[in-house]
Amino acid sequence: MNKNCLICHRKAAGQHYGVLSCFACKMFFHRMVVENLHYCCQKFNKCYEKFIILPKCKACRYQKCLEMGMQAFPRRVKSFEESMDLKIQRMLMNLSEMDEQRHWRMLNSYSIEDPSLGDVLVDSNVMKIMRKPSNQKVTAHEWAFLDVYSRISHFSNFEFMNNISFADRKLIFSFNCLRTGVFHGSMRTLREQRDCLLTPSGEDVYPDAVHNLFKDSPGLLNRTCCLLVSKLIELKVTNEEYQLLSLIFFCNPTISHNLSDFARNTLASHQIKYSSALFRHLQITNPGTAPVRFQELISLVHVINRVTNDMQHVSMMFQCMIPSFKFKQLVTDTFVDCGVVQKKSNVKILNEKPCADSSQDFIFHKNKFIH
């Protein structure tokens, strides 16, 4: 480079702090800024005006740097809170992308096979999946089957599930598939700006035979299709809140006394992780009301459990009254019979709110589930 430094007129080495300058002037400016140095000129701050010999006045040299346009661009160290927020942001983006892919595969897939929950957990490729023909009519029961399969595939992609035993995973999925399906279906209904649950293709979730069976108590069917949706509408639940809540509810460590200690501890640690992320997200989006909002969102589990219990009752009554109808085995294992694992499961946070530690993430100190 044949150009001269704009500060001292010696040979320039490049652009430093926004100004063509030499290394000496670069390091001088750097020290002045980093060490917060201050000097005074004894000659009226005019040492760098028409000089022949390079002046030794540091005050005027620094003033010349500023006049030529040097600006400090200090490297900003992210605070703990900022680093945590970025992690949560990336987590939410990843969860949303995974859920969108799951939903797309469910909408565009079809299968006539009939594996059990155990079959799918042993070999995820046991079921032959084909691309759904555009003219393929899908019944409500088939949608339930495809939804269950998509959820097993979806949650199996989480790394923490890989280390859990087959027996524990079977308990976890048999308990959670219907509940997560009800939650997602109601959230989908909210996004579609409707107030009553329908299948993805827009049909009634119950066939005429079920309506005839419950013609004297239509309120039960209406409750299963509308109660959770109305609550989501009331709370204006966002997609980010939904993504985290799904995992908080899925990672329930007390769904069964038959769960191993390892599985229970794994679920509990991840429930804390996603609960912490949700609370921090609410602190950003709902400053001042995050604790109240958090409790409102967590209380959705009671509505989900009530709707789930009602759906199980409808399914079992339908099976008893019309025994000739054959449920897909995957639906039976996770829908009709899932109540066998645990008939009642109500979530309650024991008088504790997430608390902030100056050096740790927001966590639950007592995050327990009571039956």
Swiss-Prot record:
SUPFAM superfamilies: Glucocorticoid receptor-like (DNA-binding domain), Nuclear receptor ligand-binding domain
Location(s), subcellular: Nucleus
Organism classification: Eukaryota, Metazoa, Ecdysozoa, Nematoda, Chromadorea
Name under which the protein is recorded: Nuclear hormone receptor family member nhr-51
GO molecular function, one term: RNA polymerase II cis-regulatory region sequence-specific DNA binding
This protein's record includes keyword 4Fe-4S: no
Gene that this polypeptide is encoded by: nhr-51
Role: Orphan nuclear receptor.
DNA-binding region extent: 2-77
Zinc finger (NR C4-type): 5-25, 41-60
